[in-house]
Swiss-Prot record:
GO molecular function: rRNA binding; structural constituent of ribosome
Biased composition, class Gly residues, residue ranges: 21-35
Subunit structure comment from the entry: Part of the 50S ribosomal subunit.
Superkingdom of this protein's organism: Bacteria
Protein name in the entry: Large ribosomal subunit protein uL15
Functional description taken from the UniProt entry: Binds to the 23S rRNA.
Record HAMAP family: Ribosomal_uL15 (MF_01341)
Protein family (similarity comment): Belongs to the universal ribosomal protein uL15 family.
InterPro entries the UniProt entry points to: Ribosomal_uL15 (IPR030878), Ribosomal_uL15/eL18 (IPR021131), Ribosomal_uL15/eL18_sf (IPR036227), Ribosomal_uL15_bac-type (IPR005749), Ribosomal_uL15_CS (IPR001196)
């Protein structure tokens, strides 16, 4: 078989039905739209319109609200941090801050209030990490590897005047 002998399977491609081309075509006159009425007209699609019946979105009660003061934290997993150190994107000897994580590409470009360290994956080396927040299991895993974690809450408490 040569490239010039390739053919589509029979029935895999078919022409679309041309509408409004006489009764004999099978799709003539009303072109499959039935008779009269709003749905037979042009440009009918009104999303959520139920013909004067109270629409579903108005029948159901309102729920919840959007908190405009919500703080969103970028998640960074220990496995990703360990891989970045192994790849040479982060120097294990320095303090790993949020800026270091951002330059290494572990934190996205979105507007985040800070970075939260999570415990997914393994950390094989001792690292000092300074982030906005960390899960208890992540802190335990870092300390088990011989490193330490400082969170923003702990820093603020330490700097607060007595």
């Amino acid at each position: 078989m040569n490239l010039n002998e390739l053919r589509d399977n029979a029935g895999s491609r078919y022409r679309k039905k041309r509408l409004g081309r006489g009764i004999g075509s099978g799709k003539g006159k009303t072109s499959g739209k039935g008779v009269k009425g709003q749905k037979a007209r042009e440009g009918v699609s009104l999303n959520g319109f139920e013909g004067g019946q109270l629409p579903l979105y108005r029948r159901l009660p309102k729920r919840g609200f959007k908190n405009i003061f919500r703080k969103e934290y970028a998640p960074v997993n220990l496995g990703a941090l360990d891989k970045a150190i192994a790849d040479g994107k982060i120097d294990a000897g320095t303090v790993v801050t949020e800026d270091v994580l951002r330059t290494a590409g572990l934190v996205g470009s979105g507007k985040f209030a800070g970075v939260r360290l999570l415990a997914k994956g393994e950390l094989a080396r001792a690292v000092t990490i300074e982030v906005s927040g960390a899960s208890a299991t992540a802190v335990a895993a870092v300390e088990k590897a011989g490193g330490s974690v400082r969170t923003k809450a702990a820093r603020d408490e330490a700097q607060a005047p007595a």
